[in-house]
Every structure is written in structure tokens, then in C-alpha cells.
Curated annotation (Swiss-Prot):
Localization annotation: Nucleus
Subunit structure, interactors included: Associates primarily with CDK7 and cyclin H to form the CAK complex. CAK can further associate with the core-TFIIH to form the TFIIH basal transcription factor.
The gene coding this protein: Mnat1
GO molecular function: cyclin-dependent protein serine/threonine kinase activator activity; zinc ion binding
PANTHER family: CDK-ACTIVATING KINASE ASSEMBLY FACTOR MAT1
Name of the protein this chain belongs to: CDK-activating kinase assembly factor MAT1
Keywords from the UniProt entry: Acetylation, Cell cycle, Metal-binding, Nucleus, Phosphoprotein, Transcription, Transcription regulation, Zinc, Zinc-finger
Any one of the GO BP annotations: G1/S transition of mitotic cell cycle
Modified residues (N-acetylmethionine): 1
Lineage per the UniProt record: Eukaryota, Metazoa, Chordata, Craniata, Vertebrata
Record-linked Pfam families: MAT1 (PF06391), zf-C3HC4_5 (PF17121)
Native organism: Mus musculus
Function per UniProt: Stabilizes the cyclin H-CDK7 complex to form a functional CDK-activating kinase (CAK) enzymatic complex. CAK activates the cyclin-associated kinases CDK1, CDK2, CDK4 and CDK6 by threonine phosphorylation. CAK complexed to the core-TFIIH basal transcription factor activates RNA polymerase II by serine phosphorylation of the repetitive C-terminal domain (CTD) of its large subunit (POLR2A), allowing its escape from the promoter and elongation of the transcripts. Involved in cell cycle control and in RNA transcription by RNA polymerase II.
């Protein structure tokens, strides 16, 4: 925290935790007091790099590294021009090349690399694709409106559910108070024994609790994320698919070498004569001499017939 501070007045967040740092398009930070002092006329030059700046373009620094704030702002401006989508390209390769070009432009503008040619390239692209840029802007605006409408519907439905739950709770409290008052009235006016009245009141209270605890079905609501909330989950078994039985196909391995004998034939062919016999402890763990010998033969025979082309 003590590393974050205003380069002009040298005030740090360690000394002043409420310090508000501002950043502009050049990526250099200034505290709010220095911004008000240096840009009292609405415009001025950055004390670090001398770039002409407007006071209205200053914004609160969100990231610890001001370069990240600069990159975020540059990316927003670049994407307003380079706003093509995947469906605007005939192939995925061309779309990926377009995305790579966008990243290169953002990198150059963020790190001050070849600024003149990069800005000229953006101007040429903007002129050549003016119609496509405008069409995608309108498309994006429509999608934002649809998203805002979905969020508003979600908010209204959430408010309706909240009011519904609140009314249910108030109704439950009213029924409980009514039941309690009825019990008190019976105690005053009835000639029945208190134990019997108490048992009847307990039974009525239990039935009332069971009625109140019954789950109420709620209408499924589709949120802006596309997830339906409140819907009942079906526990019915999945329908069995009638398919042909799996048929095992032996694995065909091309070793470019002689055929390795089967494991069962290694002892007859003399391959196990000089292989250490497996101990009882080895056998308990699943180890056999023929298994190790078979693996060694596979490694030894592999690639013996290979010839370079």
C-alpha cells in the first residue's frame, strides 16, 4: 500500500488511507487534489509525460498497476472500432487472425510501440469498414436492451416473490395468534378439564404447523443467465437406449519389429531361463516373471525393422 501514491505531491496511501488516485489515457496517476489543482481550467499536460489531457477523462484508479487501467480503457476504445464477430468471417482462421490483430493494436497503444503506424492502421480500417462497424453497434445496442429488459423482469419477479413470502409469513403469524386466542377463550368459558383442552390445542397447533409447512409450488422463472429457478426436478428414470452390445476389438500395435511371443509361450521358448523368479511377496502384489520379460521383449523388438525414408 505504501508504494501507491501520487508522484507529484508524494502522498502515499500508507500515510493517507483515504487517498483517491486518478488515472488518464496516458496511464500516469495523480491524486484527486493534484487533478483539481493542475486542471482547474479543464485541460492541461501530464506532469510525467507532457501528454495533453482533459480533466473529464480522469477516472478513479481500479488496479494497483496503472498500466492495467490504461490497457482497459484502450481496449474499450479499440473494440468500439474492431467490433466484428465470428459470424462476420467465412472461417475460424480469419476470425482468429482478426483477434490477434486486435491484441497487437492494444499492446502497441498500451506500451507506446509504433504509435503512428498503429493509429494510421486504425483510421484506415475504420474508413473501409464504416458500414459493418455501424451495423454491429446497432446489433450490440439491441442485445444490451434485451439484457436490460431481462434484468428488469428478473427484478420485478424477485420483488413479487419477496412480497408473496412476506404475506405468507404474516398470514402464518395471524393464524398462530388466532389459534392461541381461541385456546385462551376456551379456558375461560369451557367446563372441560384443562388437560383435555390443552391436548386439543396441541393437536390443532400440530395440524396448523403441518399445513403451513406444505411446500407451495412456484412458477418457474427464467433469469437473465438462462437458468430456471423454482422448477420441480424430475426424478423419473432415464429411458433406456436400445443399442448393440459392445464388441471387443483387439488393439493393433505397429512396432516396426519382430512379433513378440505370447506371455504363455515365454517359458517354453527359453526366454525365462535368465529372468529372476518371482518371490511370494511379488506374486501377492501381482508381479510375474513372464510379465516383466514380455515388457522387456516389447521394448527390445520395437523399431528393429524401421528404415528412414
Amino acid at each position: 500500500m505504501d508504494d501507491q501514491g501520487c508522484p507529484r505531491c508524494k502522498t502515499t496511501k500508507y500515510r493517507n488511507p483515504s487517498l483517491k488516485l486518478m488515472v488518464n489515457v496516458c496511464g500516469h496517476t495523480l491524486c484527486e487534489s493534484c487533478v483539481d489543482l493542475l486542471f482547474v481550467r479543464g485541460a492541461g499536460n501530464c506532469p510525467e509525460c507532457g501528454t495533453p489531457l482533459r480533466k473529464s477523462n480522469f477516472r478513479v484508479q481500479l488496479f494497483e498497476d496503472p498500466t492495467v487501467d490504461k490497457e482497459v480503457e484502450i481496449r474499450k476504445k479499440v473494440l468500439k472500432i474492431y467490433n466484428k464477430r465470428e459470424e462476420d468471417f467465412p472461417s475460424l482462421r480469419e476470425y482468429n487472425d482478426f483477434l490477434e490483430e486486435v491484441e497487437e493494436i492494444v499492446f502497441n497503444l498500451t506500451n507506446n510501440v509504433d504509435l503512428e503506424n498503429t493509429k494510421k492502421k486504425m483510421e484506415i480500417y475504420q474508413k473501409e469498414n464504416k458500414d459493418v462497424i455501424q451495423k454491429n453497434k446497432l446489433k450490440l445496442t439491441r442485445e444490451q436492451e434485451e439484457l436490460e429488459e431481462a434484468l428488469e423482469v428478473e427484478r420485478q419477479e424477485h420483488e413479487q416473490r419477496r412480497l408473496f413470502i412476506q404475506k405468507e409469513e404474516e398470514l402464518q403469524q395471524a393464524l398462530k395468534r388466532k389459534n392461541k386466542q381461541a385456546f385462551l377463550d376456551e379456558l375461560e368459558s369451557s367446563d372441560l378439564p384443562v388437560a383435555l383442552l390443552l391436548a386439543q390445542h396441541k393437536d390443532r397447533s400440530t395440524q396448523l404447523e403441518m399445513q403451513l409447512e406444505k411446500p407451495r409450488s412456484m412458477k418457474p422463472v427464467t433469469f437473465s443467465t438462462g437458468i430456471k429457478m423454482g422448477q420441480q426436478i424430475s426424478l423419473a428414470p432415464i429411458q433406456k437406449l436400445e443399442e448393440a452390445l459392445y464388441e471387443y476389438q483387439p488393439l493393433q500395435i505397429e512396432t516396426c519389429g519382430p512379433q513378440v511371443p505370447e506371455q504363455e509361450l515365454l517359458g517354453r521358448l527359453g526366454y525365462l531361463n535368465h529372468v529372476r523368479a518371482a518371490s511370494p511377496q511379488d506374486l501377492a502384489g501381482g508381479y510375474t516373471s513372464s510379465l516383466a520379460c514380455h515388457r522387456a521383449l516389447q521394448d527390445a523388438f520395437s523399431g528393429l525393422f524401421w528404415q528412414p525414408r
